[in-house]
Amino acid sequence: MRSNNNNPLTRDEILSRYFPQYRPAVATSQGLSGGSCIIAHDTHRVVLRRHHDPDAPPAHFLRHYRALSQLPASLAPRALFYTPGWMAVEYLHGVVNSALPDADELAALLYHLHQQPRFGWRIALSPLLAQYWSCCDPARRTPFWLRRLKQLQKNGEPRPLRLAPLHMDVHGDNIVLTSAGLRLIDWEYAGDGDIALELAAVWVEDERQHRQLADAYAARARIDARQLWRQIRLWHPWVIMLKAGWFEYRWRQTGEQQFIRLADETWRQLRMKG
């Protein structure tokens, strides 16, 4: 269901107009951010998501909805409703763990995603990194950051090994173990890109876990494991800069100290690696 109303509504207006029998449920952290909430009617729950990034154009939020609309139920929650500024999606009942699933399970989930038809829009990291630089706190801009940004822009993004639809925010809190298996939530960064970029961006604990995931994926996708790992390493500098820039961006938006701590730690990692 999609509304054609062009004026963003408040949450209460959304509820009264489109979900009159629903009420906000007890707060939960399942894939929620920036004013999103769970609404419930009897035992039925729906996730009501708000477009919470003031610097992102409305088209990005619509892409999120379109991605969910074309993904199968074996991967993601169903998209239920869209109006400018809001969407409603299926609530997935299950268990969310902070830790990633084991390598074989996660590789199977990602390979299943990468076998789907492409979304129709490419992920471009270079303009995104430039946006993070321009939108961050000016006091946080350093010569080191600028040098790294210009070096990546000069080199250009790696040539894709294999193009596919990507999730691009794979970590334990975005994976739900349902009665039917693993599902991914929080698809706001989804787009088409290199499968090795997806694997490079997974929030792993260490290189050992990363190699296990890469090897499991290579076996499933019938790709040479060494070739895949080399491609993942080519994307690694981009992913680290992406994370550092995103932490800076979110700190400027929210003022939450967790983001500045994460940004500082990521910059330290970058400096240690030269």
From Swiss-Prot:
SUPFAM superfamilies to which the protein is assigned, alphabetical: Protein kinase-like (PK-like)
Annotated keywords: ATP-binding, Kinase, Nucleotide-binding, Transferase
Pfam families in the cross-refs: APH
Biological process (GO), any one: thiamine metabolic process
UniProt pathway annotation: Cofactor biosynthesis; thiamine diphosphate biosynthesis; thiamine phosphate from thiamine: step 1/1
InterPro entries: Aminoglycoside_PTrfase (IPR002575), Kinase-like_dom_sf (IPR011009), Thiamine_kinase (IPR014093)
A molecular-function term among this protein's GO annotations: thiamine kinase activity
EC id: 2.7.1.89
Top-level taxon of the source organism: Bacteria
Catalytic activity line of the entry: thiamine + ATP = thiamine phosphate + ADP + H(+)
Coiled-coil annotated spans: none
Enzyme class: transferase
Role this protein plays: Catalyzes the ATP-dependent phosphorylation of thiamine to thiamine phosphate. Is involved in thiamine salvage.
Family per similarity comment: Belongs to the thiamine kinase family.
Protein's UniProt name: Thiamine kinase
Native organism: Salmonella typhimurium (strain LT2 / SGSC1412 / ATCC 700720)
